Amino acid sequence: MYKFDYLVFIGRFQPFHFAHLQTIQIALQQSREVIIALGSAQPERNIKNPFLAEERQKMILANFSAEDQARIHFVNIIDVYNDQKWVEQVKQLVNAIIESRSHVGLIGHFKDESSYYLKLFPEWTMVELESLKESMSATPMREAYYEGKIIESAFPEGTIQFLKTFQDSEIYKQLQQKYRAQDSSNLI
């Protein structure tokens, strides 16, 4: 018997690393279904957000069995620089998936000041996780990636395969050039 009908996990997953994997594994143990809210889901690429929402979905699902994949749902959250509008967007997208009278929770880790959004959903039961994988940050992982390295100790196998394939793309080369120039603008 699960504690929740749905657990929501919000993140950018740029890229999907072991702490993300561990969080979803815990969510799958505690909830019948897991809703992954992919942040920064607008169809733009830049050095902070190199992967589109559809690519992140594939990267994430590549790390789970078919049985677990069937229990994972995605919603795409567009960046809105207004907390109230952003919260409304998240709730609206989640509510489109859940069944009425469902017990919904929010799973996450307060890693730093950027995690304040976890407190914006008081109607959802908070499942606060202690530090996972030493509070991994994707920023140095992306930087290494743009330098041509994949920190294999940070990523599950499905992510490693995705990153290796993506490295062969023209888009990766364009992002790598933007990184070297410290150009944070979107790819055109």
From Swiss-Prot:
Keyword set includes Nucleotidyltransferase: yes
Function according to Swiss-Prot or TrEMBL: Dual substrate specificity enzyme that catalyzes the formation of NAD(+) from nicotinamide mononucleotide (NMN) and the formation of deamido-NAD(+) (NaAD) from nicotinate mononucleotide (NaMN). Shows nearly identical catalytic efficiency for both physiological substrates. Plays an essential role in all three routes of NAD biogenesis, de novo synthesis as well as the deamidating and nondeamidating salvage pathways.
InterPro entries: Cyt_trans-like, NMNAT_Nudix, Rossmann-like_a/b/a_fold
Record's protein name: Nicotinamide/nicotinic acid mononucleotide adenylyltransferase
Pathway recorded for this protein: Cofactor biosynthesis; NAD(+) biosynthesis; NAD(+) from nicotinamide D-ribonucleotide: step 1/1; Cofactor biosynthesis; NAD(+) biosynthesis; deamido-NAD(+) from nicotinate D-ribonucleotide: step 1/1
Family: Belongs to the archaeal NMN adenylyltransferase family.
GO BP terms, alphabetized: NAD biosynthetic process
Phenotypic effect of disruption: Essential, cannot be deleted. Deletion of the gene could be accomplished only with complementation by another NaMNAT or NMNAT encoding gene.
Protein's organism: Acinetobacter baylyi (strain ATCC 33305 / BD413 / ADP1)
GO molecular function, one term: ATP binding
Keywords: ATP-binding, NAD, Nucleotide-binding, Nucleotidyltransferase, Pyridine nucleotide biosynthesis, Transferase
This enzyme's EC code(s): 2.7.7.1, 2.7.7.18
More about this protein: Identified as an attractive target for the development of novel antibiotics against pathogenic strains of A.baumannii.
Reaction it catalyzes: beta-nicotinamide D-ribonucleotide + ATP + H(+) = diphosphate + NAD(+); nicotinate beta-D-ribonucleotide + ATP + H(+) = deamido-NAD(+) + diphosphate
Top-level taxonomic group: Bacteria
